[in-house]
Every structure is written in C-alpha cells, then in structure tokens.
Amino acid sequence: MRQNKWKFLMFFILLLLDSNLLLAGGVTPSGKNQQKQKVVKNKKEQVDGGIFQAPLYGKTINVIGDSYVKNHRRPYEEAWHYLVAGKYKMNYRNYGRNGRCLVFDRTSEKWGKPMLEYYREMNDTADYVLVIGGHNDADFIARGKGTLLQFEVGLDSLCRGLIAKYPSAKLAFVTPWRVPGQAFEAVTSVIKKVCGNYSIPVFDASSSSGIYVWDETFRKLYFQGPNDMAHLNAKGHQLFFRKGEIFLLGL
C-alpha cells in the first residue's frame, strides 16, 4: 500500500516538472496547436500576398477568340484563361464564339464575322487584351476559301486596330495547337511574323504548349472528344493552366 502511494507521489512530481518546463519554454499543450495554426496561416498570407502583388491582380482582361475561348461544348468557366483570371481576382470578359476566324468572314456559314471586325464591339476599357485564334483561318485556307496573303493583310489590320483601340493595354496573341493539318504551320508563322512587326507578344502553342494534339491517347485524356483536335476538356485546361499563367504574368 505504501509502495503504491510512493509511485503516485513520484508520478505527480514528474507531471508538475513537465508542466513547468513547458511553461518556461512559452508553450502550453494547447499552444502547440496554436503554433501550428499560426505557421499555416502565415503560409497562406504569403501566398495571398504574392497574388496581391502580381501585375494581373484586380485588372480587367478582354479575351477574344474562337472556340478556344468559348470552350466549345463546355462552360468557359473551365477554360485556362478564366481560371487564371479567377486566381488573380481579375475582371474577366469573354468574347469567344465557336467557328470564328481572325480574318475571314464566316457569316454565310453561320459562324459570324471575324475578329478583324468584331473587336470593335468589345468594351473599350481593358488592362489586358488576349487574342486566341487562327485555327479556323487555317481550316478556311485549307478548304481553298481564302489565301495566306489575305490572312496576313487582315491580321496586320487587326493588330493596328487593337493598338489604336487599346493604346495603354497589354496585348497578346495565342496561336493554335500543333494540329496535323494543312495550313496550320503557315498560319502560325504569319501570326508570329505580323505580331512581331508590332512588338505584340505571342505564345506559340504549336511549339511550347505541351499539348500533343496528334496523339490519340492524349486526346482521350485531355480533349473534349477522342477525335477533337481543338478543344481541351477540364483536365486539359488544368494541364495548360500554368503555361498560360506564366505567359500572362510576363506581359
């Protein structure tokens, strides 16, 4: 009986010593959790602070284009450009239409007028203007309905018009993916050439996107259909998101 009392007394003394050591170090049992929570909160504040300080934060972006912008049969809220805008709390305007060309008028085919004309209808105020197109122009040329020279002349007019409409905005273009079809490579080359003449940055999605349009297995995973060579699904947009984000941050 006396031995049990001594054991209890020793346990009580050790418990008091342990508590005093914790208090001397400025930590309580609940303080351990509080310290962890503070570290996590500080990390979140650092992340948020980085977003607040980013050049995109709170700015207005007009995105004009074809189904790469409209996002075809899926909501445009899944598109990489919308996701980037959301991350940086941007005012996002989507001016995408399925089937639209940069230069060629497809009104007779029920796909509407080109960006060369439609850009005038966009809101006049924007900090960023992102143009995504060329896929339908390449198809139009491949079908013999337009020429590469017409495309170049029209694109030159579009660039001059955008600069006049948005003299203070940051302009940029994104080319089509590397589609294994006639005229796509030539159209991409013209986009880079004409935009280069006006010092407008271009993201060459045919060479730097990491989007392997020609691979059937890849398309099954990241496109809206196994035979689709234009439209990313939600996973595809997530895959491309970081590259698009870096491009916009660097404008």
Question: At which residue positions do the language-model features occur?
Answer:
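Conserved beta-strand segments of alpha/beta enzyme cores
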Residues: 91-93, 170, 199-201
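Catalytic His-Asp segment of secreted/periplasmic serine-dependent ester chemistry enzymes
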Residues: 108, 178-251
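Conserved SGNH/GDSL esterase-like catalytic core that processes O-acyl groups on lipids
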Residues: 57-63, 68-148, 153, 182
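Conserved beta-strand termini and adjacent loop/short-helix elements that scaffold enzyme active sites
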Residues: 95-97, 174, 205-208
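Solvent-exposed, polar/charged alpha-helical surfaces in well-ordered, non-transmembrane soluble domains
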Residues: 78, 82, 86, 149, ...
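Active-site segments of SGNH/GDSL-like serine hydrolases
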Residues: 135-136, 159-191
